[in-house]
């Protein structure tokens, strides 16, 4: 008996070990394929396979890359030096066009798989990194970006790459990563013309935070100042207002989140951008306010707007809860890892925290059309777009069922009505027929009586003659 118990326990232990092991959990994850890469030019292959953003291999229009795998290739992951123009990928006798989404880090699926692929360029391009993968789900560090949101549950405005993590990161990990909501990030400053590596780090940090929709960015340079007035001399403020207003109208967010009006540690650029967002949410519903974007996207009145460190209607997010979708890490742990992706900025003193003066957990409700908060949830009094779609679908299904029931009831009523009419008509016919028979009987009876009367009179006359 004891031996049986031991055997059962051993089997259960083996079952738990096998089915909880990382190998079992990851058996459908794609692995990197060993490849031979051949360039049509004299470029250096090692510079686009060394995993560094500081090296690249350049190509001219018409150049090509041939990638041959030891096993079938089912996806490519390319990190471009700059956002590419359109390019083509040929395999298995077909040619497809890519580069249409404007992704700096581009993931391309090849559903049927191919042993040999050819990339052909239509303009001058450069690649920092290229990887090929087998069949299966893309590894977690491969950025399979979705296009920017059609409609955003939450629109996060950040001045620079890394501000969204240091000061607004709890929003990204909690609502974008854990709750898988439509979170869109929009930056003011671009680094393509000044520090290209920060464009790569921006994407790496967002992906680590759980964001899946590709960010958008203004075309404003990164300039430092220590006051709002100084920043307004560096930038054309109306251009910034136009950008923030257009972005709000484009994504129609249910919630807007942006930085501190005082610029966190006093950065004039942060002040400028947060003030622009604050002004835009007040006026984006007016058609006369930047009418070009109103004509293009329509107007929009943002239901809720939060500002970092805003003193009124304060909320404090709980960033110490384990997030199941984020490997059971807390938001603080996720954002700490995300900030480390900004390798070029690690010399700065900044760090991710929810318990110091620039806490990424502290916000204030700057503006609302749906009432104040009673808790610490930015989505309080908000119905997300996915929920709205679900409600509309259920409503449409209910209306369809009700319409079907009404149509069926109407059909039954028509049948009953027709049956009743038919019955009434049949009744009338029976009555008429009966009346006719009665009339015939009466006529026959009258004729018979008349005949009897004639016969009686004849007998009476014969009797008199006798």
Q: Language-model segments: which ranges?
A:
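Bacterial N-terminal signal peptides
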Residues: 6-18
